[in-house]
Amino acid sequence: MKVSATLLCLLLIAVAFSSHVLAQPDAVNSPVTCCYTFTNKTISVKRLMSYRRINSTKCPKEAVIFMTKLAKGICADPKQKWVQDAIANLDKKMQTPKTLTSYSTTQEHTTNLSSTRTPSTTTSL
């Protein structure tokens, strides 16, 4: 009887522990990207497409990861002036309106249901 009571207690403890592990939020188990070393070279802004800041408490260093036009991630020190200038330049590019192609709809004279589309270039304001 003592053996079955002990086994029952162990089983209950195992079930309680496993449900606690399964109830953890997904973010706890999600992978974190960290930079352990930084580039020693200044990267031309012309080669850069985007960036993201890394400031997770799980990472040893705060960093910026630049994505190049060739889809390569490069870790950089956010305290360096060229990194701050590149971030400002990329932010400015994102705010600058670009030329967009839109389509104007012209109704055909024979029927009201059909339409033809002709591309026209416009600039957003």
Swiss-Prot record:
Record SUPFAM superfamilies: Interleukin 8-like chemokines (SSF54117)
Protein name: C-C motif chemokine 2
Organism: Oryctolagus cuniculus (Rabbit)
UniProt xrefs under CDD domains: Chemokine_CC
Modification type Pyrrolidone carboxylic acid: residues: 24
Taxonomic placement: Eukaryota, Metazoa, Chordata, Craniata, Vertebrata
InterPro entries, alphabetized: Chemokine_b/g/d, Chemokine_CC_CS, Chemokine_IL8-like_dom, Interleukin_8-like_sf
Segments for region (Disordered): 97-125
UniProt key word Glycoprotein: yes
